[in-house]
C-alpha cells in the first residue's frame, strides 16, 4: 500500500468532525484564550475531557504552569470568536480580545457568550510531539443554551490537523 502524500493526509484529517472551542488559561496574572479543535471526552468516571494544545503556544505555557483550565463552547451562529483567538489574546479587566469573560474562583476565564463551559483541574499531561494532550477533570460546568448546537470546524473556513505546513 503506498504512503499517502501530505496533502492527502491533511484533506483526510480535516474530515474528522471536531468541535471548536476556546481554551481559557491563566497563570501568574497572565490570561489567554485559544481556539482549539482537538477536544474530546475520554472518561465518564471520573469525568475527563482531553484537549490537544500546540507546544509552541502561549496557552501551553500557561496550562503547564497552572492547575486549572477552561473549555468554552459557542453556538454554530457565533463563529467569529474563533478567528479572534487564533492569535494571543489581549486581556483588559473583564475582557479577552474584547470578548466578555468572568473569572472563576481559580482565576480561569469563562466566556460570557459561551453556550456551554467547563472548568477543569489538570489531571495528566502527555507530550505527544508537536502537541501536548491535557486531561482535565471537570470541576464545574454550565449549559446556557441546552437546545443549541455547538460550533464545529465545518461551520468555519478553518482547517487544523494533518501534518505541519507553512507557519506551523
Regions from the PLM with identified roles:
Residues 1-168:
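Basic, polyanion-binding surface patches
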Amino acid at each position: 500500500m503506498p504512503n499517502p502524500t501530505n496533502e492527502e493526509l491533511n484533506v483526510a484529517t480535516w474530515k474528522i468532525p471536531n468541535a471548536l472551542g476556546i481554551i481559557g488559561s491563566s497563570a501568574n496574572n497572565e490570561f489567554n484564550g485559544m481556539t482549539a479543535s482537538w477536544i474530546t471526552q475520554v472518561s465518564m468516571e471520573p469525568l475527563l475531557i482531553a484537549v490537544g494544545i500546540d507546544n509552541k503556544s502561549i496557552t501551553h505555557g500557561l496550562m503547564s504552569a497552572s492547575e486549572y483550565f477552561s473549555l468554552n463552547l459557542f453556538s454554530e451562529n457565533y463563529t467569529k470568536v474563533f478567528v479572534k483567538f487564533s492569535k494571543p489574546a489581549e486581556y483588559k479587566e473583564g475582557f479577552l480580545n474584547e470578548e466578555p469573560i468572568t473569572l472563576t474562583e481559580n482565576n480561569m476565564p469563562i466566556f460570557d457568550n459561551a453556550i456551554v463551559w467547563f472548568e477543569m483541574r489538570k489531571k495528566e499531561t502527555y507530550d505527544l510531539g508537536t502537541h501536548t494532550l491535557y486531561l482535565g477533570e471537570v470541576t464545574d460546568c454550565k449549559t446556557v443554551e441546552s437546545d443549541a448546537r455547538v460550533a464545529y470546524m465545518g461551520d468555519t473556513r478553518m482547517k487544523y490537523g494533518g501534518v505541519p505546513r507553512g507557519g506551523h
